[in-house]
Amino acid sequence: MSEEFIAVSTLARNLEIAKGNEFHTILATLRSPVYINEQLLKSELSFLVTKILKLIRSGNDFDLWKGCHTSVVTCAYNPLVLSTHGGQLLAAIYSRLEQKTGFYSSVISSSHGKQLFNILISSVAIIIDLMKNKPTLSREALVPKLKAIIPTLITLSQYEPELVLPVLQRILKRNTTTFKPFTNKFRTVLINLIISDYASLGTKTQRLVCENFAYLHLLKIQVSDTSDDETQAHHKIYADSNWRTGLMSILSQFKPIIQLCGEILDFEQDNELYKLIKSLPVIDESNNKEEFLPSLKLDFNAPLTLWEIPQRLSLLADMLVAFISLPTPFPIRVPLGGINSLCEVLLGVSNKYLPLKKELRRDNELNGVINTILPQIQFQGIRLWEIMVSKYGKCGLSFFEGILSSIELFIPLKKKSNNEIDFNVVGSLKFEFATVFRLVNMILSHLGHQLNIISVISQLIEVALFLSHDKTLIDSLFKNRKSIMKQQTKTKQSKRSKSAEGAFSDIYTHPELFVCKNSMNWFNEINDFFITALNNWILPSTPHIQILKYSITQSLRLKERFGYIPESFVNLLRCEVLHPGSERVSILPIAISLLKNINDDMFELLCHPKVPVGMVYQLHKPLDLGEDGEVRDDINKKEVETNESSSNANTGLETLKALENLENVTIPEPKHEVPKVVDDTAIFKKRSVEEVIERESTSSHKKVKFVEETTVDNGEELIVKKAVNQTKEEEKPMEDSEDEEQEEFEIPAIELSDDEEEEEEEE
């Protein structure tokens, strides 16, 4: 590394006047490891820290902003500054934070007030994280200052929970003992956020509130608080006793809310559900210290007040999720059976099989609100199941089949129909069904082929295929177009406004602009579900073909949109090729055309199956010349010697060519194989001249065929039949053949005709 570098003092002097890119350059320079030098500590680095402290203590907000950024960069990349001046910088930053918190209303009203609080809180959090797990720094610089930092952060959490709660959560988890004196104050702030402002908070902030409330139960309970009976003092106190107390307190608050639903639905019609509700855990109100939520105020004359039921259940579900999902420094006891029973009860609160109370059936507005809130009540059970399955996995394996059976209750059906899905309601529950598919995918990954429930899977496939289409917002407008046109003709043209006509023209001329498209996260969940279904079941023809159409059409659309096919669709196409279903409908050609540029190994193997090269051998099998023939091995390695006679020179030449062709024969090629002789009489054997004469005299009427004798090195003889074209000779009349048989026998020299010679030359 070069020893030439910018002096720290030069950078420190320019900090006060630096702006924009110059300030960014200074921060980038301070990150260099050149400045990690003990020789610079007393002079150069101390001067830099002095300038940083001056910026932090300045009354100018921009200088404060620069001082916070510089202190964070210096402490993060220079261990010498962190070890020697980290506590001093932390104290200066949190003192300014405390000062700004006291004047929160005036500071936040400025244009940069939100950003100023953000940099102050993040700087404190970063320096605290840098000091943690360092024994000396933590003991001497961090812990003493936390006692002053925590109250300021708790006060500010009332106004900026999204910024402050993550910092307090880390401090509460790591420094539980230091946080203990401020537990009641922090609990009061959290309860106020839960009771008054919870519905107005964002999803992320709501989760932070519930997690901080759960982490307050890390503090151990005093012995005097557990029991006043001295006889129970010898019992073992578990490390999670306070945590379990809070968990059971939240779990027990579900039962009163569910019992309120008994005023809407007739639970007595389902004895099993009624027994489950009675079995839910309950804690006496006198011993329940966690009971802080106000009672619900419901009025059937004001139907919208019924929305408080799903809102309260959602709050309790968020708090219960925090208790069962957060990491803790000790093992905890989670009542999985009680949570599963609670979820079954929540899924059972449905008008699918339970009737409404008689006195509520006539009010249409009330019935509309009830039909809207019941799926939201069921959805809280699905959320709890999702967290339980994701966090505890196979620990709840015994509950999985029951969970799938209960999920069927969440699928809406049309009234007075034979299991016909109400897709209008399904379209309004798209977000909820995304959670359902995540839950089902996790369950099926554990069950796999052991599952025999196909009815729920078939219904979920229909729901997934319906929700996979982009939602058009103006479908209902086109359906009612005729009635709208009639109403428009009745109205006077003078009352029509040009602005309204222009707005409606966009709807009718560009309907594709009023479409809600699905996200890739949604497609990924659905594709995982389809892959699991195809792997584990043989689906009926209709849903299977619908899945094929979905995968092909969506792949084409996404390829045109993004320029490539997403990975989840590639996996789905691969699964469809490997599992064609009962109809044996293969989409291999279509899949190959879609994925021709991906170079997928599986599709290439299916199109061009190949045997591994190391397993291919050229085998030379022995020739079978009949029952009397002997096996000849290694014909290609031996030389054949022929005995030619003067009377059949031409025949010997042709025979020699045949032998040469025989030597070049390779067994794997069918065209060179020697045909097997089936007729034993057609086998030619060696015989002497005397045998020929005797045979001539006894059977002179038979036609004699020429054979050629050949000898092999090992003494064995191989008789090769001369292949002569006899097609024309066979076509001769029988009379000529009889005359030839009556003639005296002699061995003539075979003279080939011109036609036959031409054919042999061509061969």
UniProtKB/Swiss-Prot annotation:
Gene, per the UniProt record: RIX1
Quaternary context: Component of the RIX1 complex, composed of IPI1, RIX1/IPI2 and IPI3 in a 1:2:2 stoichiometry. The complex interacts (via RIX1) with MDN1 (via its hexameric AAA ATPase ring) and the pre-60S ribosome particles. Interacts with NUG1.
Superkingdom of this protein's organism: Eukaryota
Organism: Saccharomyces cerevisiae (strain YJM789) (Baker's yeast)
Acidic residues biased stretches: 736-763
Positions of the UniProt region annotated as Disordered: 718-763
Family: Belongs to the RIX1/PELP1 family.
GO biological process: rRNA processing
Entry-annotated residues carrying N-acetylserine: S2
Source organism phylogeny: Eukaryota, Fungi, Dikarya, Ascomycota, Saccharomycotina
One matching Pfam family: RIX1
Keyword rRNA processing part of the UniProt annotation: yes
Protein name listed in UniProt: Pre-rRNA-processing protein RIX1
